[in-house]
Amino acid sequence: MSENNNDKTTGKKTLTLKRSVLETSTVKQNFSHGRTKAVVVETKRRKITRPDEKAEPLQPITKPHVAPQRSKPRFEEKKPQEAMAKSNLSSAEMEARLRALEEAHIQEKITREQAEKEARLAKEREEILKQEIQEQEILQKQEEEKPTVPISSVSSDPSLIEKTDIPIVPKNTTVIEKRKIDENQEEERHSRRANPAKSEIRAPKIVKGADERRRGKLTLNSALDEEGSARGRSMAAMRRRQEKFKRAQNQEPREKISREVVLPETITIQELAQRMTERSVDVIKFLMKQGQMMKPGDVIDADVAELIAVEFGHTVKRVLESDVEEGIFNITDNPQNMQPRPPVVTIMGHVDHGKTSLLDAIRKANVVSGEAGGITQHIGAYQVEQNGQKITFIDTPGHAAFTAMRARGARVTDIAVLVVAADDSVMPQTIESINHAKAAGVPIIVAINKIDKPAANAQKVRTELLQHEVFVETMGGETLDVEVSAKTGQNLDKLLEAILLQAEMLDLKADPQRTAEGVVIEAKLDRGRGSVATVLVQKGTLHPSDIIVAGNEWGRVRALIDDHGRHVKEAVPSTPIEILGMQGTPQAGDRFAVVTHEAKAREISEYRQRLARDKAVARQTGSRGSLEQMMTKLQTTGVKEFSLIIKGDVQGSIEAIASALEKLGNDEVRARVVHSGAGGITESDISLAEASNSAVIGFNVRANKQARDFAKTQGIEIRYYNIIYDLVDDIKAAMSGLLSPEQRETFLGNAEILEVFNITKIGKVAGCRVTEGKIERGAGVRLIRDNIVIHEGKLKTLKRFKDEVNEVQSGQECGIAFENYEDMRAGDIIETFRIEHINRTL
């Protein structure tokens, strides 16, 4: 007896009373993901008994003295062991061993039942598979017994018959594939089974003359069968059927469609092919035939593109890049919607004649105190109301540097108010303002200001205006004139009445129901709000969320702010308004218009930016030329450039500064604005100044902390200004420092060489007598022989007798030696002179 509790089913068991008559076999199960399991199946052979015999009853396991006859020798061997165990083991140990034997028998019984169950399930699966195969064979036979249409074309035209035997594929491919899921499993199962009973699945027989049309294959034997059986469709018929199906599916080459191709001035090959709906490869092949090797990304001009499009059978419509701007400003007004609009009045005149003060008195505000130096350096737009009627005022600077601003103000105005100081009369900027107003074709109203001063002489002003073809009413003309005082407010109401009277005569009307259109008065870059443009709406009504194009920039209107800082919902004609939401800062004087969608606005903006860039490049190329030309020009002319980076608060001021600096240069030095823009000074401006060796100028703006630190590190000075006079004066002084000083030569005297001495360690020394003026030590000298200057240099030694002296007067003798020159002869004349350097100014 063994104490090992081994519950595995094997051929030999140690804890049995008799050898079990079992037949073993192994069943291998396959699961998903490649897992397998082997199960041992034991089949007990039944004992055959006769009817008159009784089965031998099973003896209880716990009685060792009862033993089966077949195991008698084995039992007899165990007898002394059990007797010995009885004598040596206690009752508790004996019970434990008997209990272990019982558990082993129970485990063996469970294992045997599981194996029988697995074998039964495997047999059932095999029977189900056989049944399915039989059903498939029956269905296949029924299908093949159906009548088929005979094929006459095959017998009539044997040349169309395929001459190679084509194997026939059975229809029960799904069943065969099901059988072949795991071929190794079936082979192993049948090889290990004790009573192998393989059920070979034979391919179903194909009935002669069956419908082979479904297979699409035909053999020579079946086509030439003489028994008159039904024949399938020929291969030629199958091909014709496939070609017909392809034609039905439009798989043949499509018919060429002629299109109208829009061609700009330049276009890439890829884009041209897309517009023609052709392949770019075909276009490139056509160009290769013409002898041009090009790529899809290459740019061709409109002429070549037109030839290609015509060759491919398309019509061409040529357009210009400027066509994107068509229809923006050419919108016609509806006469039925025309309504009266407020007049736009521009205040013009000489500097310090009281233009802004007059406007302040009308607006009852104080703008002058906010302007640096008491002078207007920005163009401002305001709106006032008089007797229920609105008047839009545009204030322009009077300084000479703001000529462009005055011209811009005159172009957008309806009436020009010419302010002339009664104590100062007509001045240069007054004349310029008159010319601007006449060029713009707007009527003029003369406002004679400062009439309250004792030195005021209004009649003198009227008389001087006659010289410039401005005829006031008191002098028999048609121009209105009003004597006013901005300080006391005298006759301001008369001035406003004159403006309204002139506007009534002009009959100003506009259509508020159309899209907005106008002009940019001023533009700046605000730190918190971004690009801010002050515009004057001339036509239509401007609303928030409108998409506008102003010059080279575009944007969507985020907010509309009036001259009092209030947000408004719309801006009607003749209204000055601030716009927020521009993508960039437009230039003052640019026209703006509302467009329908964002794509068009972006296209117009990109076209204008490209045009401005090309003009700038052409201007630089024309002024610079090639490198050799530039170097030759620098060597011959010696022009020096004073590079500047200008940052200002608004575009108009930057424009005025650049215009003033252009007038400062001469043939030797000139100012060059490397970069200019509205907004504060940033670190990138300092980097650009370092790279271009430029000076940084801030006009009414400041540098941020990063820019200041970087400028301090790089040693770049930043100059701040708020008055344009001071800026221009400082730049003028700095540019004057670049001018080469003027050299002025002063004649000192002449000396005649009497004899030349050769002295050791010194060289040749000329013994001379001063014949005119004096000879000074360190002066410049010229050696003249036969009235020809043969040497010019400096005086090295001047001695009288044996002593070094600073100067020798006329009539005295002295010894003279030259620096690095010794070719002196008796009779030569030595001329001495002094050169003075005098600084020049612009």
UniProtKB/Swiss-Prot annotation:
It comes from the Bacteria. Gene3D superfamilies: P-loop containing nucleotide triphosphate hydrolases (3.40.50.300), Translation factors (2.40.30.10), Translation initiation factor IF- 2, domain 3 (3.40.50.10050). It is found in: Cytoplasm. The keyword NADP does not apply. Residues 340-509 form the tr-type G domain. Belongs to the TRAFAC class translation factor GTPase superfamily. Classic translation factor GTPase family. IF-2 subfamily. Residues 449-452 are annotated as: G4. One of the essential components for the initiation of protein synthesis. Protects formylmethionyl-tRNA from spontaneous hydrolysis and promotes its binding to the 30S ribosomal subunits. Also involved in the hydrolysis of GTP during the formation of the 70S ribosomal complex. Keywords: Cytoplasm, GTP-binding, Initiation factor, Nucleotide-binding, Protein biosynthesis. This is Translation initiation factor IF-2. Pfam families: EF-G_D2, GTP_EFTU, GTP_EFTU_D2, IF-2, IF2_assoc, IF2_N. GO terms for cellular component: cytosol. InterPro entries: EF-G-like_DII (IPR053905), EFTu-like_2 (IPR004161), IF2_assoc_dom_bac (IPR013575), IF2_II (IPR044145), IF2_N (IPR006847), P-loop_NTPase (IPR027417), Small_GTP-bd (IPR005225), T_Tr_GTP-bd_dom (IPR000795). Residues 349-356 are annotated as: G1. Its main location: cytoplasm. GTP binds at residues 349-356, 395-399, 449-452. GO terms for molecular function: GTP binding; GTPase activity; guanosine tetraphosphate binding; translation initiation factor activity. Residues 374-378 are annotated as: G2. CDD domains: IF2_eIF5B (cd01887), IF2_mtIF2_II (cd03702), mtIF2_IVc (cd03692). Residues 42-91, 139-253 are annotated as: Disordered. Residues 395-398 are annotated as: G3. Residues 485-487 are annotated as: G5. Residues 176-190, 199-214 have a biased composition (Basic and acidic residues). It comes from Bartonella tribocorum (strain CIP 105476 / IBS 506).
